[in-house]
Amino acid sequence: MEFGLSWVFLVALLRGVQCQVQLVESGGGVVQPGRSLRLSCAASGFTFSSYAMHWVRQAPGKGLEWVAVISYDGSNKYYADSVKGRFTISRDNSKNTLYLQMNSLRAEDTAVYYCAR
């Protein structure tokens, strides 16, 4: 019984640590093809300026697709071929926020977008 209580406590402790990292996306919407949208991702619970950050997306009925990555200081950016020249990833380390500017949107860009560390 003593072992069981210790195990439950350990699980609760680990879950608490995981919950300290928060990434909250905003800015999505429904737009016509050819229009623009800007997504934001507010980060907390870790030193944002120390990490490269990614955007990934999941289209309806499909798997996850990597979209873009930006280095910790914003000096390097890489994009999936499907969005290159249309999407721009950026960050503001003073605001702990990641951005994705999406221009010339297409029907195939329809997806749930996630930021990831």
Swiss-Prot record:
InterPro entries registered for this protein in UniProt: Ig-like_dom, Ig-like_dom_sf, Ig-like_fold, Ig_V-set, IgHV
Keyword Secreted set for record: yes
Disulfide bond annotation, renumbered to this chain: 41-115
Region described as Framework-1: 20-44
Gene Ontology CC annotation, any one: extracellular region
Region of interest called Framework-3, as start-end residue ranges on this chain: 78-115
Modification Pyrrolidone carboxylic acid, positions: 20
PANTHER family: IMMUNOGLOBULIN HEAVY CHAIN
Role this protein plays: V region of the variable domain of immunoglobulin heavy chains that participates in the antigen recognition. Immunoglobulins, also known as antibodies, are membrane-bound or secreted glycoproteins produced by B lymphocytes. In the recognition phase of humoral immunity, the membrane-bound immunoglobulins serve as receptors which, upon binding of a specific antigen, trigger the clonal expansion and differentiation of B lymphocytes into immunoglobulins-secreting plasma cells.
Entry protein name: Immunoglobulin heavy variable 3-30-3
Lineage: Eukaryota, Metazoa, Chordata, Craniata, Vertebrata
